[in-house]
Amino acid sequence: MENIILELEKSLFKYEFMSDIEYLNKIIDDKYVEVGKSGRKFLKNEVIKDLSILKQDRKISIYNFTCDKIGEEIYLIHYITKSNEDNIYRTSIWKKENGKIKIIFHQASLYKEKVNLIEY
């Protein structure tokens, strides 16, 4: 499951998937909530709108990825990305229900700790 979720997270940075509203509706849960590094809260429809208007891949790499099963078919994801010189600590919650895997929560926070980055 870890590799599947890693690929789903990566897909949210790739133009071919971000521009596919049907795909985004399929992997983003209707109750999805995101708290961006700006501190703003976003819901599913806002995220889909914002992603679908991008015209190219987001230049983001994933570092220090971890995946923990925290409930029956619920997975807690942590990883770091870089934005300019800043490290961004990201947390997502994914669930598998009726054979479908969907993201239900995501948060991005500025991360000031020194850390060795391992790319995934």
Write out the residue ranges for each language-model feature:
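A beta-strand edge to alpha-helix "cap/lid" segment located at domain peripheries
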Residues: 2-18, 31-120
